[in-house]
Regions:
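N-terminal helix-turn-helix DNA-binding module of bacterial transcription factors
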Residues: 1-65
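Amphipathic helical "hinge" segments at domain boundaries
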Residues: 60-123
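Hinge/beta->alpha junction and helix N-cap segments in small-molecule ligand-binding domains
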Residues: 80-87, 109-120, 141, 176-184, ...
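Non-catalytic structural scaffold of enzyme domains
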Residues: 122, 126, 190-193, 207, ...
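Hydrophobic alpha-helical
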Residues: 134-135, 139-153, 224, 239-299
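Flexible loop/hinge segments that line or gate small-molecule binding clefts
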Residues: 144-181, 298-306
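Hydrophobic alpha-helical segments within soluble ligand-binding/sensing domains
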Residues: 174-202, 250-251, 297, 301, ...
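Hinge/cleft segment of the Venus flytrap/periplasmic-binding protein
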Residues: 212, 228, 317-356
């Protein structure tokens, strides 16, 4: 017959919880967070709570020593699956920088999820928040995603948006480029490559986007159009097509653009999978005639630069971006300003002649 001893112990612990809180000078909610090893409590407060628990014999001394040993912060990175090699490079970074991040005491995990699906992204953010102490992800502008971010904020689980930000949420920080400036940079490069036009002739330029549900892509488009209006009135933007960062779709969309505009002078790939764009240009025999600027230095875009099918790549360091995410999360864990000591993302423009 069950004597009820475990239940008695549970009652004793419940009765002692307010005593631990009083002795430590904190709330019972803080005690609960510490004893269940949830994030968001300053290290000094954690130590005070654990010592109070040991003094009141709420926590055996051996358990106290074990609890005082810092547990790794569990971090999840949610990245879109697909053929975007630069995104895959960011995920791979988590694996090979593991030892480099040892001083931060973190345990990182990468999940690849369906691209351009806001409901799936929102579900994945919430699911990750149940088991992780911090979640980083590429955001999509959608009410369901905003709600997921704010739900985790209420649970004291920090979130960091990576590459593409989201508006009107309680996300902790954004890691990535100034995307409006990136779009303006692309327009400037294409405008200069094309060169001056007479008042009677215009040059046609087109854009390929992953999806404008990415705020990053929307901002790049806005910056791109804005600079042409300001500085290159002789250049006409004739269209924007979405290829969902998929090489096959980008190939098909570029083929259509080239058929509709055989005199196309420039293409700006706002997102990834530039190899699909270049393949269509090469098949049409215009790879060395049409100015092509895109994003993300990867083995694919590197090869395109070398063979002259691509003119410039606007990129950022995947290692710096992922390390910045880790630093932000550990700052939050340690009660510091989230962006304290975090390196601001810087864009680089890579040509064939300055390949690193």
């Amino acid at each position: 017959m069950n004597t009820g001893k475990p239940a008695s112990n549970a009652l004793a612990k419940a009765a002692l919880l307010p005593d631990v809180a009083r002795l430590a000078g904190v709330s019972t909610a803080t005690v609960d967070r510490v004893l269940n090893r949830r994030p968001g409590v300053r290290p000094a407060t954690v130590e005070r709570v654990l010592k109070a628990a040991a003094e009141l014999k709420y926590l055996p001394e051996n358990d106290l020593y074990a609890a005082l040993a810092p547990q790794p912060m569990r971090l999840t990175f949610l990245l879109p699956a697909g053929t975007n090699r630069f995104i895959r490079m960011m995920g791979d970074t988590v694996g090979y920088l593991h030892e480099h991040w040892a001083p931060y005491n973190v345990r990182c995990h990468v999940d690849y999820i369906e691209s351009f699906n806001p409901e799936e992204l929102a579900h994945s953010v919430l699911r990750a928040g149940e088991r992780a102490d911090g979640v980083a992800f590429m955001a999509l502008e959608h009410p369901a995603v905003r709600e997921a971010v704010n739900t985790l904020a209420e649970r004291k689980v920090p979130t960091v948006t990576l590459i593409s930000d989201i508006s009107n949420t309680l996300r902790t920080a954004y890691v990535g480029l100034d995307n409006r400036a990136a779009g303006r940079t692309a327009a400037y490069l294409i405008g200069r490559f094309i060169g001056p036009r007479s008042s009677k002739t215009t040059a046609k330029v087109a854009m390929i986007a992953g999806s404008l549900s990415y705020r990053a892509h929307e901002e790049r488009e806005a910056g791109f159009l804005q600079l042409f209006q300001e500085q290159f009135p002789g250049i006409e933007v004739v269209g924007l097509r979405e290829g969902h960062d998929d090489a096959r779709k980008n190939y098909e969309q570029t083929k259509v653009l080239l058929e509709q505009h055989p005199d196309l002078a420039g293409i700006y790939n706002i997102g990834g999978a530039s190899d699909g764009v270049a393949r269509a240009m090469e098949e049409a025999g215009c790879a060395h005639k049409v100015v092509f600027v895109g994003h993300g230095l990867s083995p694919d875009t590197r090869a395109l630069l070398i063979r002259g099918s691509m003119d410039a790549v606007i990129t950022q360091s995947p290692q710096t971006a992922m390390t910045s995410c880790v630093r932000i999360f550990t700052n939050v864990r340690d009660g510091l300003e989230p962006m304290g000591g975090v390196e601001v993302a810087r864009s680089q423009v890579i040509f064939r002649e300055n390949l690193p």
